[in-house]
Amino acid sequence: MIDLEIPKKFVPLVKQAGSMADEVFRPVSRKYDLAEHTYPAELDLVSALIDGMTDSGASNGAGAAGSTRAKDGTDQAPASTDADEATGVTKPASGTKAGKVNKNGANMSSALSIMQTCRGDVGLTLSIPRQGLGNAAIAAVANDEQKERYGNRWAAMAITEPDTGSDSGNIRTTATKDGDEYVLNGEKIFVTSGERAELVVVWATLDRSLGKKAIKSFVVERSNPGLKLVRLEHKLGIRASDTAAFVLEDLSLIHI
């Protein structure tokens, strides 16, 4: 039988996210819907709160940086949870049946908290600094040195293209090796928080003839002169969240 009750360990997180939706997001939701492209300054406090919860382990893995991938492909639990050191799988809480493990605790905590904040305002939820799709990608696959360098910075994700949509296996943006550098050329659209973020994780292909196997992701500084902002979209909804379009023109990245 499917149990639809919220696990007890997540109840405090859900209540806190619900309070944020009611007390922070709802009062300013209409304001930022009308003031499209204006950054919601209230989110600075929200992001600081999330950072503090993540650092303390109180978030139970919620948030972009809350879950990394173990070598076996399971979600690694945050440091404060009871997890097996070898697999990163959360052990059963006291009182639960032996043999049961939670392989998706971080995903569940993120989903439950996002459900609450989206009730407050979807656009504001998508605009929380350091909680972008790019941050989730960095947390999931970056090495320790990359996490140290980029972990505390806001990262957007650039996958979608005008001619391919979000079909990642058909990406046309290219990354060409040139000595110690990669040179990226192409176009990206529908980049959530692309103009506001400090970094953009760009998906590009090393060789179009190889299909998905040649698709790689590159962390690009938003200030890189080769990453040119074309426009911010004017939308019918979710207007508190900016959606950007970029052109990459001979964007140079040093291969480290």
How should each PLM-predicted stretch be described?
Residues 175-176:
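A structural signal for short hydrophobic beta-strand segments in well-ordered beta-sheet cores
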Residues 181, 185-228:
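A short core secondary-structure module
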Residues 1-128, 149:
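Amphipathic, small/basic residue-rich leader segments at the start of a protein or domain
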Residues 254-256:
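Conserved small/polar residues in nucleotide/adenosyl-binding loops
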Residues 102, 127, 163-166, 190-193, ...:
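Short Gly/Pro-enriched turn/cap motifs at secondary-structure boundaries
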Residues 225-250:
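Flexible, small-/acidic-enriched active-site or ligand-binding loops
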Residues 96, 114-115, 122-145, 165-168:
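N-terminal glycine-rich flavin-associated loop
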Residues 152-161:
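A short, Trp-centered hydrophobic/proline-enriched beta-strand micro-motif
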